[in-house]
């Protein structure tokens, strides 16, 4: 998925869609993060709805924000 070595990848569920392609995601470990859609998902018009399972990349510097990189089928 990502070429970056210092990111943390976790799975979660979309709990709330927000404006400007932002989403509130409930991670599998119970934490909630604010995540936006990655650029490639925007370019390919991949739609994300409430309840979808997604893969989220988190930065080790700010664990409250993330980037959605994959939507599971």
Swiss-Prot record:
Domain S1-like positions: 1-73
Source taxon at top rank: Bacteria
Pfam families noted in UniProt: eIF-1a
SUPFAM superfamilies: Nucleic acid-binding proteins
Subcellular location: Cytoplasm
An example Gene Ontology CC term for this record: cytosol
Broad class of the protein's primary localization: cytoplasm
Record's keyword annotation contains Membrane: no
Keywords associated with the record: Cytoplasm, Initiation factor, Protein biosynthesis, RNA-binding, rRNA-binding
S-S pairs: none
Keyword rRNA-binding: yes
InterPro entries: NA-bd_OB-fold, RNA-binding_domain_S1_IF1, S1_domain, TIF_IF1
GO molecular function, one term: ribosome binding
Subunit details: Component of the 30S ribosomal translation pre-initiation complex which assembles on the 30S ribosome in the order IF-2 and IF-3, IF-1 and N-formylmethionyl-tRNA(fMet); mRNA recruitment can occur at any time during PIC assembly.
Record-stated family: Belongs to the IF-1 family.
Function: One of the essential components for the initiation of protein synthesis. Stabilizes the binding of IF-2 and IF-3 on the 30S subunit to which N-formylmethionyl-tRNA(fMet) subsequently binds. Helps modulate mRNA selection, yielding the 30S pre-initiation complex (PIC). Upon addition of the 50S ribosomal subunit IF-1, IF-2 and IF-3 are released leaving the mature 70S translation initiation complex.
Protein name: Translation initiation factor IF-1
